[in-house]
């Protein structure tokens, strides 16, 4: 995921790199940067299958059209994430196209969510589209948030720490 963000021009760095339970972890420092669309090759899919929902959100704010390929595994996660991502992007006014194992997302200057985001009880879909809602004048509404506590119980408190207003 980090490599794809760097390809897109993200200004991010790792600090305080360490190991926890046999996995590398770090603090991430991110600064504003203008993102650009990229082709995300299929060889990234296995290592970042859970990051595609948030990557699609970032793609909606990247100049150009981002194409992600090799996404068949997204269809058999907690939900058919490929369709969930696509349908919800369309609900937010983001231009997108998809096929059996690919997704294209085009830059969207103004996100306008006129319909409730359908999460399909998938925490990653819920969190990703709530983040997209931060760029919408009136935010977004999602149909369910209970499942977010499963993976990130501090999600809303962290957003509030950043000054996000949550209704």
Regions found by a protein language model. Give the residues of each.
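Short, structured segments at the rim of ligand-binding sites
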Residues: 1-167
């Amino acid at each position: 995921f980090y490599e794809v963000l760097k390809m897109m021009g993200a200004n991010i760095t790792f600090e305080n790199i360490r190991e926890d339970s046999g996995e590398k972890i770090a603090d991430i420092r991110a600064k504003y940067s203008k993102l650009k669309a990229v082709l995300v090759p299929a060889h990234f899919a296995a290592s970042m299958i859970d990051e595609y929902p948030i990557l699609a959100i970032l793609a909606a704010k990247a100049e150009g059209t981002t194409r992600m390929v090799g996404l068949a595994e997204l269809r058999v996660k907690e939900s058919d994430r490929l369709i969930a991502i696509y349908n919800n992007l369309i609900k937010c006014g983001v231009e997108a196209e998809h096929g059996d194992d690919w997704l294209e997302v085009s830059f969207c200057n103004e996100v306008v969510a006129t319909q409730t985001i359908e999460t399909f009880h998938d925490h990653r879909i819920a969190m990703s589209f709530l983040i997209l809602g931060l760029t919408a004048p009136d935010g977004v509404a999602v149909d369910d948030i209970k499942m977010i506590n499963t993976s990130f119980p501090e999600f809303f408190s962290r957003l509030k720490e950043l000054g996000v207003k949550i209704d």
